[in-house]
Design a protein with these regions (language model features):
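A ligand-binding cleft/hinge motif common to bilobed small-molecule-binding domains
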Residues: 94-102, 149-151, 180-212
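Extended ligand-binding regions for polar small-molecule ligands
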Residues: 1-14, 55-63, 129-135, 140-143, ...
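Beta->alpha turn/N-cap motifs
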Residues: 33-38, 72-77, 86-98, 121, ...
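Periplasmic-binding protein-like
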Residues: 111-119, 195, 199-236, 254-268
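Ligand-binding cleft/hinge of the Venus flytrap
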Residues: 58-67, 144-168, 199
């Protein structure tokens, strides 16, 4: 299966593994709820296996803890209840860290996400006012159409520039195709999705800076001893040895890389 990490090169770290709850150590696996509908974070290959950069990162973190991974495919809305019910140890699904989530969960933050635009390589977007008056594609019902682009409109008007012309699409693939065909000037999505589309375009598209950044990562249940710290330490060691950067680069999401892995780093 497609992967950006060589697990055979990762040595288990006994000092970190000692922090794991006894039930996980005895089981020998991390049970992970995953919603594989969000390329490049987690999605399915032709054989139905979960792949993506968060899958690679969790496989590597598990190897660092001397564990294997057991992915259970689930709907996004069902993952957190299953973590709280201890059916899953953690979840993957592009989770943003928020104060609300921290009430019942510990969020292991290993990424910075936000809103990001892609445009033709010869017309890069350097700052947000660059999109005033442009035709911009976004996904129907997504945060870009509902929140981000209306806020940009206000900034455009305040600066005496024309509003953004927003065109809604049902899927990410449709808006990427429209941009490549010249029907759009730019498209907007979550930064990992935009970064991956840019990577797949083989130089035709270029990404903007990330706007409205938030910390993102994996939720685990509170009160599971040192589990959150074990996971944080495992990913931190992957950051130190270059594995983390290698995975992010492979999947085109390096713009969201962070310098320190934290637990519950969000302040709002």
């Amino acid at each position: 299966r497609q992967t950006g990490v060589d697990l055979s090169k990762i040595k288990a770290d006994d000092a970190i593994a000692k922090m794991l709850p006894a039930d996980i150590t005895e089981r020998g696996t991390l049970i992970i709820g995953v919603d594989p509908t969000y390329a490049p974070n987690e999605f399915k290959d032709a054989q139905g296996n979960p792949i993506g950069w968060e899958i690679d990162l969790m496989d590597a973190a598990a190897a660092k803890l001397g564990l294997k991974t057991d992915y259970r495919v689930a709907k996004f809305d069902n993952i957190v209840p299953s973590i709280l019910g201890e059916k899953y140890d953690l979840g993957l699904g592009g989770y943003y860290d928020t104060k609300k989530r921290q009430e019942t969960l510990d969020m292991i933050d290993f990424f910075q996400a936000g809103e990001q635009l892609a445009s033709p390589a010869d017309k890069p977007i350097k700052e947000i006012l660059d999109i005033c008056g442009l035709k911009v594609g976004a996904q129907n019902g997504g945060s870009a159409i509902l929140n981000f682009l209306p806020k940009v409109d206000e900034q455009c008007v305040a600066a005496g520039k024309p509003k953004v012309e927003v065109l809604g699409y049902e899927t990410q693939d449709e808006q990427t195709s429209a941009l490549l065909l010249g029907r759009l000037d730019a498209m907007e999505s979550d930064s990992p999705v935009t970064g991956y589309a840019v990577k797949l375009s083989e130089g035709k598209l270029v990404g903007s800076p990330i706007f409205d950044t938030v910390l993102a990562g994996a939720p685990v249940k509170k009160d599971r001893g040192e589990f959150a710290e074990a996971l944080r330490s495992a990913i931190e060691s992957l950051l130190e040895d270059g594995t983390y950067d290698g995975i992010l680069n492979y999947w085109g999401v390096e713009v969201g890389g962070i310098q320190q892995i934290t637990v519950n780093g969000a302040t709002e």
